[in-house]
Amino acid sequence: MKRFLHCVSVLLLFELAFSSTDTLHYDVTVFGIRCGKIFYSSEKENISITALSSGLIEYFYPFKNDYHTSFDTLTFGIRSYKKTVKQGDFKQRLSGKWDSSTEEFTYDNFDSFKRADSCMTIFTLLERLNRENPEKLDTKWFPIEHEGSLYRSRVLLAGTEKILINGDSIVSNHLRLDLIPDDREIKMLDRSDYFSQNITHSESIKQIWVERKPSGKILKASVKIGPITITATITNK
């Protein structure tokens, strides 16, 4: 059950990070049973995300997580971050800002971390994929700031596929995301929400199907941890 909850939480936010400027809705399912829903909206330099439990999971593990990120529209480097998490009995708030004068990202009530101007987060990286042609980013490495830890990230273009969405066959780019930790980093938090804690899990296999340009929004995604695969599918294409 714990591994199942990890997968659900990871995919909920992972799927959110791909979308257009409209508010998009996604259903998340495991074994064909809906367990969560996602609301995502982005403006020019801001991303707002809400993930909610639904279906059977609402009865034994309700959650409502809000994430807000601002970023540089040229480099997609993080400028500010705020999250408010409620997962069962666990609650957490975290916020921080990037200081251009010191090139540090400082978390309120926590430490400061030296980060380059172009250092992204998982959310801004995925938003970048939403706005740019994945072929231009294929196999390239980028630094990722993640709650005080530094990672190297890359997307791998696995090919072009047709997937079925609401009865329509749509051509999409099939991507895989890799995240590799910098071993010199020490974890800032003893505990975090399931998404933040497990998106970097060494065993998680993250795959995304993004509609080919011009719209570029994500159509479907899957996250696999161990034997469990969770799938998210857009509902308001």
What are these regions (language model features)?
Residues 9-12, 127-134, 159:
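Generic secondary-structure transition motif, activating predominantly at the C-termini of alpha-helices
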Residues 4-5, 117, 154-156:
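Small/flexible residues
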Residues 20-98, 143-237:
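Acidic, serine/threonine-rich low-complexity disordered tracts
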Residues 4-16:
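Sec-dependent N-terminal signal peptides
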